[in-house]
Amino acid sequence: MSQISAKDVKELRDTTGVGMMECKKALEETGGDMQKAVEYLRKKGAAMAAKRADREASEGVVCILMSDDQKTGVILELNCETDFVARGEVFTGFANELATLALSNNCESREDLLGIKLGEAYGNETVEEALKSMTGKVGEKLELKRMARLTAEAGVLESYIHPGSQLGALIAIDTDKPAEAKALAKDLAMQVAAAAPIEVSRDAVSTELVEKEKEIYRQQALAEGKKEEFVDKIVMGRLNKYYQEVVLTEQTFIKDQNTKVSGVLDDFMKKNQAQVKVKAFVRYQLGA
């Protein structure tokens, strides 16, 4: 067996990011052949990924990245098994690399991103392959749970990441006064993160979900002994309250409990003689 030098071990570590002892073992197993050692470590990572496939990956980070012109943004959730790994530079660096890759390749979804190739730092592997290699590197199951992309060609895009990177929101606003709307968009990104709406307006809430809620309220009212002739009115009252909880424009504004988000939008339009409309938003909370 050829002598394994510290220089070779360091070179392999710099190439793969795997620990020194694992790199030394890989070189010993492959007779000091650097390329074979890299392949050995990749296969070992894939084997570990398969072994840990049933593990629960419920920790991790939510990562957001926007283009320089702030017209396009991506948000993703990358999971691992423990908070210790989630806070490490290797994991967070990988999450940021995935966000950069998603943005530069105009990825629309997780499936799009999984097939894109990373650079030399990650062995020119696809994201799907790199997730397995990174499992071998950090010793935990890694999973790209979800990813989304928003654009705001006719307006402004803003984001909010809560400290700890476990909650984030991305929002797109259509407006003819984008510069003036920056602060508004930031406030609304925080609103989405804090209040967890599911749609921009009540018209966007699915009929299936509305009917499900109405049936729940109907059964509740009957169980409470309410008279049949009053049940429909009670159901509509509770449904309106539900809309106020889950529809962005009908929520109470987090910075002023006496104002609805719709009122904030109206005030902005009057003050700035501008048009403004929430186009879309995405909210990711770790594990949710």
From Swiss-Prot:
A GO cellular-component term linked to this record: cytoplasm
Family: Belongs to the EF-Ts family.
Places the protein is found: Cytoplasm
InterPro entries: EF-Ts_dimer_sf, Transl_elong_EFTs/EF1B, Transl_elong_EFTs/EF1B_dimer, Transl_elong_Ts_CS, UBA-like_sf
Protein name: Elongation factor Ts
Function: Associates with the EF-Tu.GDP complex and induces the exchange of GDP to GTP. It remains bound to the aminoacyl-tRNA.EF-Tu.GTP complex up to the GTP hydrolysis stage on the ribosome.
UniProt cross-references to HAMAP family, sorted A to Z: EF_Ts (MF_00050)
NCBIfam families per the UniProt record, alphabetical: tsf
Alphabetical list of Pfam families matching this protein: EF_TS
Gene3D superfamilies: 1.10.286.20, DNA helicase RuvA subunit, C-terminal domain, Elongation factor Ts, dimerisation domain
Superkingdom to which the source organism belongs: Bacteria
Database matches in SUPFAM superfamilies: Elongation factor Ts (EF-Ts), dimerisation domain, UBA-like
Keyword entries, A-Z: Cytoplasm, Elongation factor, Protein biosynthesis
PANTHER family referenced in this protein's UniProt entry, alphabetically: ELONGATION FACTOR TS, ELONGATION FACTOR TS, MITOCHONDRIAL
Region annotation Involved in Mg(2+) ion dislocation from EF-Tu: where it falls in the sequence: 82-85
GO molecular function, one term: translation elongation factor activity
